[in-house]
């Protein structure tokens, strides 16, 4: 793994933490539940792969999109 790859993954990990916190705050969830929703979301691989520059979207926007995907699947 290159230094650039390591930096990108560090940035993504920080983004995931902010998404988890935003989802917990917006929907009254525990951090554990928010983390579970994020890591099982079909959007996570798209964010990781940079599809449509999703990783550039705001944390709250992504938290809401992930929440909507979760509730629609329920």
Language-model features: locations:
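C-terminal alpha-helical interaction appendages
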Residues: 1-74
């Amino acid at each position: 793994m290159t230094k650039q790859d390591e930096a990108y993954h560090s940035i993504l990990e920080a983004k995931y933490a902010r998404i988890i916190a935003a989802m917990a705050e917006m929907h009254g969830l525990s951090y554990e539940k928010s983390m579970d929703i994020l890591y099982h979301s079909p959007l996570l691989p798209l964010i990781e792969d940079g599809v449509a520059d999703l990783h550039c979207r705001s944390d709250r926007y992504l938290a809401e999109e992930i929440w909507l995907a979760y509730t629609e699947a329920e």
